């Protein structure tokens, strides 16, 4: 009887079919779908062909009557009424690991300069993480050497401190950031280039950052021509 009960539980918990939804409306920057069953922040794929090879990644951001409201992460070109929608059942995550160093990723963590399958990334990390408890934050007390004497000597930066660099175009903001990335005592740099032009990205990586800085950096690219929904997601 115990074996029969175990088999029954296996059958009861098994998944024997998959529910899909269909795109019903595209309104502004959002897509409305009839089904599938979903909850807020679930990651969904909107397929652009019957073979379900090409798809647009999207996130459940709300509900309206019997519709699911989706916010796409990619360009919505090709999305139309009737496109199949599949729910992955989990929120958006990004692959992380030491082999990500020296590479560039897009606004939602996809590797852009090689095939992600060639990298041995340790785990998946959710992008929606609760903020740390204010009382658990360390007090800023240690100096973070940035390797630029004028900054280290006159406007010393502490570990964990936020700073802003404000200046007009072409006066050296990117050059200064590149100097920080190459010379800082930090083990890893995460550099987000948001709203940059394509040529400016290559100039920063090759000239300002250089091979030495890039070797211990991960560069997040959110170029000026990307779809609007992706940009605020990355900035947040």
Predicted feature locations:
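The Walker A (P-loop) glycine that initiates the GxxxxGKT/S ATP-binding motif of P-loop NTPases
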Residues: 167-168
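Conserved P-loop
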Residues: 176-215
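P-loop NTPase nucleotide-binding/switch module
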Residues: 83, 112-161, 176-179, 213-224
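Conserved lysine of the Walker
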Residues: 173
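Single conserved hydrophobic/aromatic residue that forms the stacking wall/gate
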Residues: 224-236
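N-terminal accessory targeting/assembly segments
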Residues: 1-103, 107-112
């Amino acid at each position: 009887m115990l074996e029969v009960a175990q088999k029954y539980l296996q059958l009861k918990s098994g998944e024997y079919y998959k529910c899909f939804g269909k795109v019903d409306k595209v309104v502004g920057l959002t897509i409305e779908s009839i089904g599938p069953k979903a909850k807020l922040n679930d990651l969904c794929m909107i397929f652009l062909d019957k073979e379900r090879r090409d798809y647009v990644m999207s996130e459940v951001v709300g509900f309206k009557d019997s519709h699911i409201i989706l916010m796409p992460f990619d360009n919505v070109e090709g999305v139309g009424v009737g496109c199949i929608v599949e729910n992955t059942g989990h929120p958006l995550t990004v692959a992380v690991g030491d082999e990500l160093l020296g590479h560039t990723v897009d606004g939602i963590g996809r590797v852009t300069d090689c095939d992600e399958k060639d990298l041995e990334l340790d785990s998946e990390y959710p992008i929606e993480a609760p903020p740390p408890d204010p009382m658990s934050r360390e007090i800023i007390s240690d100096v973070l050497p940035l390797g630029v004497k004028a900054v280290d000597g006159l406007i010393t930066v502490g570990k964990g401190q936020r700073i802003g660099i404000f200046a007009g175009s072409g006066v050296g903001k990117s050059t200064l950031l590149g100097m920080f990335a190459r010379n800082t005592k930090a083990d890893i740099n995460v550099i987000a280039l948001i709203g940059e032009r394509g040529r400016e990205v290559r100039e920063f990586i090759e000239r300002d950052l250089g091979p030495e800085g890039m070797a211990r950096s991960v560069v997040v690219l959110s170029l000026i021509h990307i779809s609007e929904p992706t940009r605020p997601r990355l900035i947040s």
